Curated annotation (Swiss-Prot):
One of its GO terms (molecular function) is metal ion binding. This is Ferredoxin-like protein in nif region. Pfam families: Fer4 (PF00037). The keyword RNA-binding does not apply. Keywords: 4Fe-4S, Electron transport, Iron, Iron-sulfur, Metal-binding, Nitrogen fixation, Transport. Iron-sulfur cluster binds at residues 9, 12, 15, 19. One of its GO terms (biological process) is nitrogen fixation. It comes from the Bacteria. The gene is fdxN. The lineage of its organism: Bacteria, Bacillati, Cyanobacteriota, Cyanophyceae, Nostocales. Residues 2-29 form the 4Fe-4S ferredoxin-type domain. The keyword Transport applies. It comes from Nostoc sp. (strain PCC 7120 / SAG 25.82 / UTEX 2576).
């Protein structure tokens, strides 16, 4: 088996619906896994890429299993470092939005107090 379902899987079941061989199974606990007896990695089919990988909305839910330990280690390391160093502006956007709303409310209440 060249592909596996990772912990990044969001259980959307899209991979199981696009798998041409029905190799993606769902365990009793809801966790997805790939049956290596059924998986053909979409080789010798009309598809040019494995459909589980192509259909995954998370991009990391279905990944290729590296043949070499260190290849897998560095692939995981590079993926994690890229995620950690990516600029995340969530809190900046949150602050800008709510500080503006707070400022508007404060001015409104100050106007009411001074007008009374």
């Amino acid at each position: 088996m060249a592909y596996t379902i990772t912990s990044q899987c969001i259980s959307c079941k899209l991979c199981s619906s696009v798998c041409p061989t029905g190799a993606i199974k769902i365990a009793e606990n809801g966790q997805h896994w790939i049956d290596s007896e059924l998986c053909t990695n979409c080789v010798d089919t009309v598809y040019t890429v494995p459909q589980c990988k192509a259909g995954c909305p998370t991009c990391d839910g279905c990944v290729k299993v590296p043949s070499d330990y260190w290849e897998g280690w560095f692939a995981n390391y590079n993926r994690v470092i890229a995620k950690l160093t990516k600029k995340q502006d969530y809190w900046e956007r949150w602050f800008n939005c709510y500080s503006q709303k707070f400022s508007e409310q404060l001015q409104k209440h100050q106007g009411e107090i001074l007008g009374v």
